[in-house]
Each structure stands twice: as structure tokens, then as C-alpha cells.
Amino acid sequence: FVDLTGGFGVDFSFMSCSFMKRIYVERNSGLCEMARHNFQVLGLEAEVVNGEAEEYLKKMDHADVVFLDPARRDEHGCRTYDIKDCTPNVIDLMPLLLEKADTILLKLSPMLDWQKAVRDLGNHVHEVHIVSVDNECKELVLVIRKGSTEQISLTCMNNDQKFRVVPWGGTKCSMGWNKREG
């Protein structure tokens, strides 16, 4: 598991537990030191790399899963609303990401147009997850895999409710609104 945009390490701490090898990459040295300390306190063995996502990606070995939560602000601190304006630019990195990982998890701003993001990333997007809390959209997560697909699974979650649209063939789709169990 490789997190190319480590940040505070919260997503990394949660998601990496299912993997034997865990690599956290972050360009900010202060965040790396904080994450290293927190991982030690949590008893989470991880390799912490202080560096740019783009450079690490070029030299890294194959990974089962690569996670990215690109920065959503430009060099002036203004919010960005297009995936191509995020840092790192995932659209530019996509060919190398697909070469280096079986699955790419991409966490994006709820302000982004998910349909445009899917179009921009091409037909490797297999799943779209829209996560809400109390009817307020919090995150957009795209699951990208090698091999193209024409049928994207769309899942919307809000507290204990889950709505899923799974297309099959042409224009038909199956829809269901279910309460999550447990």
C-alpha cells in the first residue's frame, strides 16, 4: 500500500492496516515527522518518505493499491474545482499510476464534478463513491483499475443509508436504497 499524498496520515493509518508493506509519501518534512511519531504511537509499521509524489512514483516498485488525496488549492491558496488543477496532477500521472499499481484510490473534493472527473480520467474508473454525512457531501472517491470498463458502479452513502447504481448493458441500470446492516 502506498499513499502518495500522506498529509497528516489519517487516511494512511486507517487504510494501510490491511497491507503487509506500507509506504507513506509526503513532500512536507514537518508532516513526515508528525506522521512518523503518530505511526509509532499507533504501533503501525510504515516506511515514511519525504519527497514529491511524482518522483517517488517514477522509482517505486509495483503496489497492489496506491492512494492519492491531491491538494485542492493552487499556488495562491485558492480552491480548485477541476481535477487537472489539483496537486499532484493525477491526469498527467495516470499512465504511470496504472503501470505501477493494480488499484488506484483517488479521494477528491465533493466540489468537483464527479462526471467530468470520470471523463477526464478515461475508462479506467470502475467505481465512484460519494460519501455524505447528514446529507452533506464530504468526499468523492474514485476506484481506478487496470483494464477499461464501460460500466461504472456508483455508490452514494449517507450515514447509515446506501444507494447503489450498477449499470448492466446499454442504458439500463439497477438501483437500490438500502440501510446498512450492523
Q: What is each residue range found by the language model?
A:
Residues 1, 60-68, 72:
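Mobile, glycine- and charge-enriched loop segments
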Residues 1-7:
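Conserved class I S-adenosyl-L-methionine
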Residues 8-20:
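Conserved SAM-binding loop of SAM-dependent methyltransferases across substrates and taxa
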Residues 16, 60-61, 98:
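A short, aliphatic-rich alpha-helical micro-motif
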Residues 20-21, 103:
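Residues at the starts of beta-strands that form the adenosine-phosphate
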Residues 21, 45-47, 127:
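Conserved beta-strand segments of alpha/beta enzyme cores
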Residues 25-65:
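S-adenosyl-L-methionine
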